[in-house]
Amino acid sequence: MATAVETLDKLERRITITVPLADVQAEVEKRLKVRARTVKAPGFRTGKVPMKMVAQQYGYQVENEVLNDKVGRAFNEAASENNLRVAGFPKIEPKTDDAAAEGTIVFNATFEVYPEVKLGDLAAADVEKTTVEVSEAEIDKTIDILRKQRVHYHVKGEQSAHGDGGSDLTAKNGDRVTIDFVGTIDGVEFQGGKAEDYAFVLGEGRMLAEFEAGTIGLKVGESKTFPLAFPADYHGKDVAGKTAEFTITLKQIEWAHLPEVDAEFAKSLGIPDGDLQKMREDIKVNLQREVSSRIKARTKDSVMDALIKISELDVPKALIDQDVERLMEMTRQDMAQRGMKVSDLPFPPELFTEQAERRVRLGLILAEVVKANDLQAKPEQVKAQVEEFAQSYEDPQQVLKYYFSDRSRLAEVEALVLEENVVNYVLGKAKVTEKPVAFDELMSNNAQA
């Protein structure tokens, strides 16, 4: 039996549940009799163990099961009768005061309910829509990047099929150098401060700028000693903020040869006949696909920000806590896949709270927008989205099979389509401002949502 619902806070509720002990005892005895049929004990045949022994061994466990079942059933019935949408799981505790009637046990179930979501006027929402032009200059830049990805090196000063690298035999930006080095702090070598035959490309930023500067201008066989100040935020905590002295010896210099933009280069990019114009058109299509994806992500973020701004709701803490746990687990799995020892890393929940609160808030808002405007994902939309994914792979049919053979994978696509439906709906109602953005800005790493 459950009492009326008490309101403790905006979303917090409490129900008091009373369970007659006679009902509990009757159910316990019933379950123990069923269990006794299969209980084994030394000196007794299966199913012939005395009930007293069965009760001694299993009574406490069965009583807990019965109480959990009865309290859970009473809670669910009370929530249903009062039309309550419970957010998360209730906290159920025995009531400690003396209000319980004789022959009963009383529990308090404290929980949160889903909030009322008040959607504002979409016509008053401001949404920014990014626009980007893919020009010939962007195609040229991409070709340069593709050339650098296919770079190969030749020893400077030695004749090769592509020349000897010129008369300047000193190390300069773009060269790959091989060195021995040793570093000391106050005359003492430190961990990670010594290496032999260490190769890196000057100008790529793999090494600290002062280290690269100490290498530039040297010839093979030359050595140099110079001071190097480690930044205070350097990843090596033992040397961060300290000044070391490095001695380097240059052992080899290799100059970079970039492939010519010719038919062979085009073939290496998947153009069978090596036609350079086809290559440029293919690059443009790929760039436009990537630009479209990033613009869509930016626009979606702008729409979500607008929805948050115009909507009013209280977010259940229980749902935030659940999402914090999900984010923590996702982070652990991601780090483990990268080979990191997760057990050595702290995961304070507060690191994820802000992100979880936004995710939960948006989820509640989106659900309300979808329900109010009938924006559910339609089967043909889901199919079209999967086919779009498949086009960027070598074997589209395998991708289609991958999604359509697993309901959970298809559900992920449905969620994306649903979000897109909401975005398109909001764009049709809100005040949309187009914002031209430079190609490089859009494609920079921190531009992707």
Swiss-Prot record:
UniProt keyword annotations, A-Z: Cell cycle, Cell division, Chaperone, Cytoplasm, Isomerase, Rotamase
Domain of life (superkingdom): Bacteria
InterPro entries reported for this sequence: PPIase_dom_sf, PPIase_FKBP_dom, Trig_fac, Trigger_fac_C, Trigger_fac_C_sf, Trigger_fac_ribosome-bd_bac, Trigger_fac_ribosome-bd_sf, Trigger_fact/SurA_dom_sf
Protein location: Cytoplasm
Domain comment in the entry: Consists of 3 domains; the N-terminus binds the ribosome, the middle domain has PPIase activity, while the C-terminus has intrinsic chaperone activity on its own.
Biological role stated in the UniProt entry: Involved in protein export. Acts as a chaperone by maintaining the newly synthesized protein in an open conformation. Functions as a peptidyl-prolyl cis-trans isomerase.
Family: Belongs to the FKBP-type PPIase family. Tig subfamily.
Protein name listed in UniProt: Trigger factor
Protein species of origin: Janthinobacterium sp. (strain Marseille)
Chain's gene name: tig
